[in-house]
Amino acid sequence: MATTILKNEGLDFHIKISTPLSEIDNDIQKELVDLTKKVKIAGFRAGKVPIAIVEKKYGASVRNDIIEKRINDSVNHVIKEHNLNIIGRPKIDDLQNEPNKPLEFTIKMELLPKIDIPDLKKISINRPKLEVSPDDVEEQLKKLAEMMKSYTKESKAKAKDGDQITMDAVGYVKDEAFEGGKLTDFKVVIGSNALIPGFEKQLIGSKAGSEVEVNVTFPENYHAKDLAGKDARFVVQVKAVHTAEPTVIDDEFAKKFQSNSLEELRTHFTKKIENESEEAISTIMKMNLFDQLEKLLDFDVPESLLDQEKNILKSETDKSEQDDSVFKDKSPEQVKEYYDKLALRRVRIGLMLAEYAKDKNLQVEPDDLRRIIMQQARSFPGQENMLFDFYKNNPRAVEQLKGPALEEKAVQHIFDNAVNLKEKKYNRKELEKLLESEEQRITAM
C-alpha cells in the first residue's frame, strides 16, 4: 500500500491510497480458496467444489468485501500512523475500483482542533443570591388566599371591583350576533381581567336583575381573526352578584396545603421562592461564563460542526418564532452574521467543555440524566408523566441527553473548582430586574 498526503492544512487531512492489483488478487484468491471448503453446491462433494465454480458464483461479492475491508483497514492504518484525532466519519472520494487495475481512493478526514484549556482562575463570575423577605412570603400567601376565595354570599347591592357576576350575554358586531358571542350562566370576577379589556369595568355598578350594555374593542391579536380589532357590543343580563368570603390565613388555611402550621407553610414558600430563582440564576451565571470563555478561546473549528450548529440554531429559531423580534429590521447579511457568530461561539465552548470534562475524568451518571429530564419536565406542567414515559420507552432519546448532561456537569465543576465566584445579595425585585435585563441581553446576542 502506497500513501500520498494531498492536503494537511488546518483541520483538513486528505490522503491518497494506492494498493497494487497483485495484493487485491491475492486477497480475493485466498478468500475464494476458503470458500471452496465451506460452500455447498449441487453436484459437488463438500470441500471439493472447483475454485472456478466458486469464483463464478461468488467472485463479485468476494471482491466487494475485499475492497471494503481494504478501505476500512487503510482508514484505520492512516489514523494510527499519523496519530489523527478525527471528527465524524472519513469520506472516501475518487474511488478507482475497476477489475484488473490497482485499487486507488482518497480519504478525506476532518480533524478535531488541539484545545488548550484557558486559565480559568482568571475568570470572575458574579453569583446572585436571593434574600427572601417576609413580605415576599406574605405576598405569595395572599395570592394563594385569593385563589381560594369562595363566592357564596349573594349581594343585592351594586357590583364592585372584586365581586363575582353571574350573567347571560349576547355579543354583536355591527348589530349582528357573532358566533361564539353568547354566554349563559357565565361567572366572572370583576378585576380578574379574564374577559376582553374594558368588559369587566363596565359591570361595576350593576345589580342582580339589571341589563347592561357593554362596548368593547377586540384586541388586534385576538385568537378569532374575524373579530380581531373590531368594535363589539354585548347585551348583558346580570343574574346574580356575589361578594367574596374573606379567607383567613392561619393554621387551618395551611393544613389545606399539606402543612401542619402556618409557619411550616411560610417555610415551604421561602424554599419555593429560592428554588424558583436558582434555575434562572444558574442560567445567568452560565451565560456570563460563556461570555468570558468566548473572549479567551481562539482555535479553528471543524466546518461540519459549524454547519450542524447553524442548522440547529435555525431550527430552534423557526420553532420559537423569534425571527421577528430578534431580526426585526435586520438585513439577510446581518442575520447570517448573527448565526455565524453564535454557532462559532457554541461550537468552541462545547469543544472546550468536552476537553475539560475529559481532563477532569467527568462521567455522566444516571442522576445527571434524571436531573436533565426533571429540568425539561418543569417546562411542561401537567404533562410530566408523558415526558417520563417517553424517555422510559426511548433509550436512544436518553442517549442523546448525555452530551448536554456532560456539559452541565463540566460547567458546574468549573463553578465549584475553577473560577472565582463573587456572591452578591439581591432582594426579589432587584433580582427580577436583573433577570429581565439579562434575558433581554441574551435574546439580543
Swiss-Prot record:
**InterPro entries for this protein:** PPIase_dom_sf (IPR046357), PPIase_FKBP_dom (IPR001179), Trig_fac (IPR005215), Trigger_fac_C (IPR008880), Trigger_fac_C_sf (IPR037041), Trigger_fac_ribosome-bd_bac (IPR008881), Trigger_fac_ribosome-bd_sf (IPR036611), Trigger_fact/SurA_dom_sf (IPR027304)
Q: Which reaction does it catalyse?
A: [protein]-peptidylproline (omega=180) = [protein]-peptidylproline (omega=0)
Q: Name one GO cellular component term.
A: cytoplasm
**This protein's record includes keyword Cytoplasm:** yes
Give its localization. Answer: Cytoplasm
Q: Pfam families of this UniProt entry?
A: FKBP_C, Trigger_C, Trigger_N
The source's domain of life comes to: Bacteria
Annotated PPIase FKBP-type domain residues = 162-247
UniProt remark on domains: Consists of 3 domains; the N-terminus binds the ribosome, the middle domain has PPIase activity, while the C-terminus has intrinsic chaperone activity on its own.
Q: Report the HAMAP family cross-referenced here.
A: Trigger_factor_Tig
Name the record gives this protein: Trigger factor
Q: Please report the organism this UniProt entry assigns to the protein.
A: Rickettsia bellii (strain OSU 85-389)
Upper classification of the organism? Bacteria, Pseudomonadati, Pseudomonadota, Alphaproteobacteria, Rickettsiales
